[in-house]
Amino acid sequence: MLNAHAPVDVAMIGFGAIGAAVYRAVEHDAALRVAHVIVPEHQCDAVRGALGERVDVVSSVDALACRPQFALECAGHGALVDHVVPLLKAGTDCAVASIGALSDLALLDALSNAADAGGATLTLLSGAIGGIDALAAARQGGLDEVRYIGRKPPLGWLGTPAEAICDLRAMAAEQTIFEGSARDAAQLYPRNANVAATVALAGVGLDATRVCLIADPAVTRNVHRIVARGAFGEMSIEMSGKPLPDNPKTSALTAFSAIRALRNRASHCVI
């Protein structure tokens, strides 16, 4: 059946592993048109070469040929200030994947104020974890406790404070490398903060959400677990996520979450 409506004009912020996967998934979707891609200046030529003249590839919001209807951020924390804030101020609805950055209250306020000023909507993607819809719904009746437990293979914690806690290259048994609030987890482990921050913002907040991070030689994937209780009852959900085929460090579900956000934007019936 032919699409009776004009496609939604989309700007993508970032064209790394997630951005490229999202673009490939919706490239031929009649309800969507990725007409703009915003990337750092040094990446523009390569992205133009990959996408051709049909996409407006620029390095700033000011350089866009026209204002998009919707923007999807999958570029990392810095892009929220540089690109999402001005887009929201201009009235463009945005969905963002870099939730971990929102542990910074000043940034969260800046995004909220920009959305208010532009009359736009900011959507936080669920990313690599499921159950966020249930958790956010349960919050309406009151939550007594929310915990997030994250497990990764030891080498997945290289380059983090975990290196000072244990020998990540020679572990025989699991070891807890962090216990505390979601806010502290985001500050100490910024590259691993998106899931914990998403759980916190959907539930009882960054300070009340308890986080446990574990280096576990028995797992080969990133394992996420949410435990919650409140007026709704109790909930426990665990996910063992696969990476994108062409990028072992990137959750496939994060890309699928972004694809869903785009298709929901173009749909008249949304779940």
UniProtKB/Swiss-Prot annotation:
Give the enzyme's EC designation: 1.4.1.21
Pathway in which the depicted protein is active: Cofactor biosynthesis; NAD(+) biosynthesis; iminoaspartate from L-aspartate (dehydrogenase route): step 1/1
Gene Ontology process terms (BP)? NAD biosynthetic process
Q: Which SUPFAM superfamilies match?
A: Glyceraldehyde-3-phosphate dehydrogenase-like, C-terminal domain, NAD(P)-binding Rossmann-fold domains
Purpose of the protein = Specifically catalyzes the NAD or NADP-dependent dehydrogenation of L-aspartate to iminoaspartate.
Q: Which HAMAP family does this entry report, sorted A to Z?
A: NadX
Q: Which PANTHER family match?
A: ASPARTATE DEHYDROGENASE DOMAIN-CONTAINING PROTEIN, L-ASPARTATE DEHYDROGENASE-RELATED
Q: Which family does it belong to?
A: Belongs to the L-aspartate dehydrogenase family.
Q: What else is known?
A: The iminoaspartate product is unstable in aqueous solution and can decompose to oxaloacetate and ammonia.
The protein depicted here goes by the name L-aspartate dehydrogenase
Organism (species): Burkholderia pseudomallei (strain K96243)
